[in-house]
Amino acid sequence: MRTQSLKPYHANYHSLTTNDSPARVDAPTDSGLISEFVYSENQPVVTQLLLPLLQQLSKQSRWLLWLTPQQKLSRSWLKQSGLPINKVVQLRQINPLSTVEAMEKALLTGNYSVVLGWLPELTEDDRIRLRLAAKLGNAYGFVMRPLNDTKVGSGQCATLKIHSYLYH
């Protein structure tokens, strides 16, 4: 996988649209990215796909942010994966519905090369807001959503799960 460095870009979020003109973004088209990953927890292919990109992005001077509402990242997994512990920030125990807003704000700051968020299903408005924030912050945003692999009728609730080996 080849990764291209992102050009720095700074703009005032509120100056991008006006009431008398159509919405527009002055950011270059390659200055940010939002991707949604819907994955099966039984097949950790997402880890295999994302890890090289995360390792590359960790070489930037900016942070890597993990928005994980319920779980705690495993320091041993970070070390084993080659991700710098001193550049990883994690916010957890936040309301999953507030995670979209938290992700948008984090992307806008420009302090993070990548923001990973475990989010509920996004609305089109959420997608637009996150894309704009990623462009303005010159960052990657990865929306992570595991498929509901829990069998109906097995007595288990449908909950958000993250691979346990990633967390304590």
UniProtKB/Swiss-Prot annotation:
UniProt PTM: Is rapidly cleaved and degraded by the Lon protease once DNA damage is repaired.
UniProt subunit comment: Interacts with FtsZ.
Superkingdom as given in the UniProt entry: Bacteria
HAMAP family tied to this protein: SulA (MF_01179)
Keywords: Cell cycle, Cell division, DNA damage, Septation, SOS response
Name used for this protein in its record: Cell division inhibitor SulA
UniProt cross-references to PANTHER family, sorted A to Z: BLR3025 PROTEIN-RELATED, CELL DIVISION INHIBITOR SULA
Residue ranges, annotated region (FtsZ binding): 106-112
Family annotation (InterPro entries): Cell_div_suppressor_SulA (IPR004596), P-loop_NTPase (IPR027417), SulA_CellDiv_inhibitor (IPR050356), SulA_enterobact (IPR047696)
Gene3D superfamilies reported in the protein's UniProt record: P-loop containing nucleotide triphosphate hydrolases (3.40.50.300)
Function: Component of the SOS system and an inhibitor of cell division. Accumulation of SulA causes rapid cessation of cell division and the appearance of long, non-septate filaments. In the presence of GTP, binds a polymerization-competent form of FtsZ in a 1:1 ratio, thus inhibiting FtsZ polymerization and therefore preventing it from participating in the assembly of the Z ring. This mechanism prevents the premature segregation of damaged DNA to daughter cells during cell division.
Site (Essential for degradation by Lon protease): 168
A Gene Ontology BP annotation from the UniProt entry: division septum assembly
Induction pattern: By DNA damage, as part of the SOS response.
Annotated family: Belongs to the SulA family.
Region annotation Lon protease binding: where it falls in the sequence: 161-168
